[in-house]
Amino acid sequence: MVKENMTAKKTRYISVRNGGEETYVENIPASGRMRNYLPAAKLRLREIQRVMPLGKWSITIEQQWKDNGITRFQMLDVTTGKLQESVL
């Protein structure tokens, strides 16, 4: 199970995708937990789907930080609530 990093200095943003292709990114505050932004992101996803129903829309809340020269990412899927981690 992936745990959210709460200690590192990080950048956090909302990523909107259509069919897997990123179409919009918005920076959000890095304070607090990523799950605190779920209600607003779910509302935004519903609004997008209502206006453009033919797209395969998804939203993730993402954060990234440097750890000993390695860039780490965490992605929270708004629909499933699943948290994933990646290292670059």
Positions of predicted regions on the chain:
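A short, exposed loop/beta-hairpin motif centered on an aromatic-Gly-Thr core
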Residues: E21-P39
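Compositionally biased, intrinsically disordered low-complexity regions
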Residues: A8, E22, M34, W65-D67
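Short aromatic-glycine-(Arg/Gly/Cys) micro-motifs in beta-strand/loop hairpins
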Residues: M6-E26
